[in-house]
Curated annotation (Swiss-Prot):
The gene is KAP104. Residues 361-395 are annotated as: Disordered. HEAT repeats lie at residues 11-38, 43-92, 103-137, 145-181, 190-222, 235-263, 275-303, 320-413, 421-449, 461-488, 501-534, 542-577, 583-620, 628-678, 694-725, 777-814, 825-858, 867-900. Keywords: Cytoplasm, mRNA transport, Nuclear pore complex, Nucleus, Protein transport, Repeat, Translocation, Transport. It comes from Saccharomyces cerevisiae (strain ATCC 204508 / S288c) (Baker's yeast). Binds to nucleoporin FxFG but not PSFG repeat regions. It comes from the Eukaryota. Belongs to the importin beta family. Importin beta-2 subfamily. This is Importin subunit beta-2.
Length: 918
């Protein structure tokens, strides 16, 4: 039913004025308008007025009298975006049910009728999409939702491109809801699919309509709905026809995506057509001018190679066709060659422009990812360059990179077959007179390094010296790529061929001072990879002084952009080696000098804060003279960011600093705590329990929606509990425990796993040092619920930390685990599996001490298997200070002596047992 609402002219004019003033460059006018807008938002008809200005803003007679055409168009777009924002997030006026939406539902589609104004039609499409995602999903019985879908389909049938674009956005956000019943018990999915099929089958529709329709269908494929499955053969028939006949790039790109989705969800339907599909993709890669299409085709080949649904024997016949084309597309295109040749001059002396510096988020150190409390970066991509196969970290994803990535995965899967085809080709071109051929060849070698390592084995002793020579090549791209490729061979060098380490790493270190910035960047990244992959003893013995001296030179020589990469390398170096007095004298002064020159709002602080965090932690008490100044500034930045964040909830005009300022400040403070230990207590708590500001700030940070903020804050909390007087935390203990519980119970996002790990780790330290008393029942239940769950897959590092924390809780309250959910052989066995691999003696000892207290208190009616007893003895016999809890061990052995005599132990385990039986 059409809305009978009509706007009041004075309100329309008033709102139009506010919209214009909200965009004013004058802050006073803008702020006053924002305040007035907040009052306007309280009116029930607010959304209707915004919609009216969006769709009638250029035809309303009153508005035309007061505004120019340009102002009217700007106002329409502003009204549309405000309408969209008013339906989203914390500003969602729909959920409050206090605002009339009738006019919006009945008339918003009119914004698509006049498609001459692209801005207005695009904004209208966004509003319609938002209306579906925030209102119609929850109100599927509202007939206007179904009516709007049919109107969009009808408009598309008449050639209206904004309508199909709106449908495409709606399908992307809400496709799964169209499987459900809407008004009149109708399931819209069938009508939608039939319409999309009709649009893509008819060549008379525009390329935009055809491509967007395929895009709509692509949102349905992963859902595997019955309505699509029964139409799948029809879709395949149409899509194969399009692949043969439709030469439009927009359509072809979507066809490639369709095949990629089908490969993932219905590979059985593609197997008999793979010859044609692969040839189609190779044809696109080699012939189309639009690189986006070629990238999508190459993405299919990448998916084809990595799909768990495609056995190796099916992929193998295509290697001979795919690999040569991948190699050919790894050469820079003509335009890039011209640009690179024109910019080969030295540029290291030129200052970087701020706009040329890509924002770099801090390298988050997952400090507590292992239960032993040490750094554990297993879940991180240690080699930052692996995401950019050609090392071009400043350019967007392109065909060259996609080809290199595809060659990489194919070499990992079928190394022998790929090498047989690729290596003769590469050997022929290694000495090419054309620099871009040499560069692409070196890129290919790097791309194949991981998978083909053992097949390279015979040739690498000759190949490595050749690559080192290329560090002196006249052309900067060749030198740059050589740095990256040599780093890819670092595992081969470091594991079994250390005789190559000095001949390779010394020239790369020398290349740090290259006169071309791109080469500097590649060299420092390569050095960082070698540091990361090498044993600390190797770095300290062979390269410690040389790296310190080189870092010092680089700190003086590098410009802004490469300093960011350098900070990361120094941070990795500090994590790997125990820095000494020499390091403090060489690299600390320039770091502190740069730190002092940067403003609190400079984004260059992010990597520098992370770097200083690692350096402070490594230097330990030697960092003490600088600690007060460094801490005070980090604390000031942290407080400022948290304060602005809180104020922004009341005042949306406040610009909130990026979360990275909070994360890096927390990490630097934590680095000081780790490095200085108890000596840093007076920094954080200068008045003892009289000033707990840092804890109040941390409580705010632990409620931040960004996982990395909470992750860093839990790490700091754990270290405060570990190093400082426990009385400092007791006053806020209940609040911290509630937030720890919330993290463990409700953070089920895989990206948030490190935050969960740190929360559990912190809880373990708290329970070890502070008697949880009345909180122990609730906290143990939270831990056990996750430990014993069989409804989800628990990350191994999470399980490890859960196990350690159970042990630590058992130190003071073994009774809560000696009966109930934990008290059975299966859980004990699982506990041992998680804890036995720990290397940290202190952590493992405290975990086992608490665990044995629990076991010794458990009723003898609960039987323990020989396998579990064996695992306990295995765990106790290595990396454990048994003398600290010898009585608990003795009691356990006595209680299970009959079973122990029947178990076959290793010599080390027997030696351990003899300590308690002799």
């Amino acid at each position: 039913m059409a809305s009978t609402w009509k706007p009041a002219e004075d309100y329309v004019l008033q709102l139009a004025t506010l919209l214009q003033n909200c965009m004013s460059p004058n802050p006073e006018i803008r702020n006053n308008a924002m305040e007035a807008m907040e009052n306007f938002q309280l009116q029930p008809e607010f959304l209707n007025y915004l919609c009216y200005i969006l769709i009638e803003g250029e035809s309303d007679d009153v508005l035309k009298q007061h505004y120019s055409l340009q102002d009217l168009q700007n106002n329409r777009a502003t009204a549309g975006m405000l309408l969209k924002n008013s339906m989203l997030g914390g500003n969602n006026l729909i959920k409050s049910n206090s605002h009339d939406l009738g006019y919006v539902k009945s008339n918003i589609i009119h914004g698509l009728y006049n498609s001459n104004n692209n801005l207005v039609s695009n904004v209208t499409g966004i509003v319609i999409t938002t209306l579906f995602s925030t209102y119609y999903r929850q109100h599927r019985d509202d007939p206007t939702g179904l009516q709007m879908l049919y109107q969009l389909l009808e408009l598309t049938s008449n050639g209206n491109e904004p309508s199909i674009k709106a449908l495409s956005k709606i399908m992307e956000d809400s496709a799964q809801f169209f499987q459900l019943e809407w008004s009149g018990n109708t399931k819209p999915m069938e009508a939608l699919l039939d319409s999309f099929f009709r649009f893509i089958s008819n060549p008379n529709f525009s390329p935009v309509i055809r491509s967007e329709s395929v895009k709509c269908i692509n949102t349905v494929i992963p859902l595997q709905t019955q309505s699509f499955i029964v139409r799948l053969d029809k879709f395949l028939e149409i899509i194969f026809q399009l692949a043969q006949n439709d030469e439009n790039d927009l359509v072809r790109a979507q066809i490639c995506i369709s095949f990629s989705f089908l490969l993932e969800f219905r590979p059985d339907k593609l197997v008999s057509h793979l010859d044609g599909i692969v040839q189609f993709m190779l044809h696109l890669i080699t012939t189309v001018n639009e690189e986006k299409v070629a990238i999508e085709a190459c993405e299919f080949l990448h998916a084809f190679a990595t799909s768990p649904n495609i056995p190796e024997h099916i992929l193998q016949p295509y290697v001979k066709d795919i690999v040569p084309i991948l190699l050919s597309k790894m050469v820079y295109n003509e335009e890039s060659i011209v640009l690179l040749e024109a910019s080969n001059d030295d540029d290291a002396f030129l200052e970087d422009k701020d706009e040329d510096i890509k924002p770099i988020a801090p390298r988050i150190v997952k400090k507590k990812e292992a239960g032993n409390g040490e750094d554990a970066d297993d879940n991180e991509d240690d080699d930052d360059d692996d995401d950019d196969e050609d090392g071009d970290v400043d350019t967007q994803w392109n065909l060259r990179k996609c080809s290199a990535a595809t060659l990489d995965v194919m070499t990992n899967i079928l190394p022998h077959q790929v090498m047989d085809i690729a290596f003769p080709f590469l050997r022929e071109h290694l000495g090419s007179d054309r620099w871009f051929i040499r560069e692409a060849t070196i890129l290919a070698l790097g791309a194949m390094a991981e998978g083909g390592m053992k097949y390279f084995n015979d040739g690498l002793p000759a190949l490595i010296p050749f690559l080192v020579e290329q560090l002196n090549d006249k052309w900067a791209p060749v030198r740059k790529m050589t740095c990256w490729t040599l780093s890819r061979f670092s595992p081969w060098i470091l594991q079994d061929h250390t005789e190559f380490l000095i001949p390779v790493l010394e020239p790369i270190i020398n290349t740090l001072m290259d006169k071309k910035k791109d080469v500097q960047e590649a060299a420092i990244s390569s050095v960082a990879v070698f540091i990361e992959n090498a044993d600390s003893e190797l770095v300290e013995t062979l390269f410690y002084s040389q790296l310190l001296t080189s870092f010092d030179k680089c700190l003086k020589y590098y410009k802004k952009k490469n300093l960011i990469i350098l900070y990361d390398a120094i941070g990795r170096f500090a994590e790997k080696c125990a820095l000494d007095e020499t390091a403090m004298q060489i690299i600390l002064p320039p770091l502190i000098e740069k730190w002092a020159l940067l403003s609190d709002s400079d984004k260059e602080l992010w990597p520098l804060l992370e770097c200083l965090s690692c350096v402070a932690s490594s230097l330990g008490e030697r960092f003490m003279p600088m600690a007060p100044e460094v801490y005070n500034r980090a604390f000031r930045i942290l407080c400022h960011c948290v304060e602005l964040e809180a104020k922004s909830h009341q005042d949306p005009t406040i610009v909130v600093p990026e979360k990275d300022f909070i994360i890096t400040s927390l990490d630097l403070i934590d680095g000081l705590v780790q490095g200085l230990g108890a000596h840093s207590q007076d920094l954080l708590f200068p008045q003892g329990t009289k000033d707990l500001t840092i804890l109040k700030i941390m409580l705010e940070c632990l409620q931040d929606p960004v996982h990395e903020v909470r992750q860093s804050c839990f790490a700091l909390l754990g270290d405060i509990v570990y190093f400082f007087n426990s009385e400092l935390v007791i006053g806020n203990l209940e609040d911290f425990l509630k937030l720890i519980g919330t993290e463990i119970m409700h953070n089920d996002d895989s990206d948030g796993t490190p935050a969960v790990i740190n929360a559990i780790w912190a809880l373990g330290l708290i329970s070890e040092r502070i008697d949880l008393n009345t909180y122990i029942i609730d906290m143990s239940r939270i831990i056990l619920d996750l430990f014993t769950t069989n409804t989800q897959i628990v990350d191994s590092s999470v399980m490890e930390n859960l196990s350690v924390t159970i042990g630590k809780m058992g130190l003071t309250h073994p009774e809560v685990f000696s009966s109930g959910a934990f008290a059975n052989d299966s859980n004990w066995n699982k506990w041992c599996l998680s804890v036995n691999a720990l290397d940290d003696v202190e952590e493992k000892s405290s975990a086992y001490m608490g665990f044995l207290k629990i076991i010794n208190l458990t009723s003898t009616e609960v039987t323990m298997s020989n396998d579990t007893i064996h695992k306990i003895v295995t765990g106790l016999s290595s990396n454990v200070e048994a003398n600290v809890f010898a009585q608990e061990i003795y009691t356990f052995l006595m209680n299970h002596s009959a079973q122990i005599s029947a178990i076959n132990f290793t010599p080390d385990e027997i030696s351990f047992l003899q300590q308690f039986t002799s």
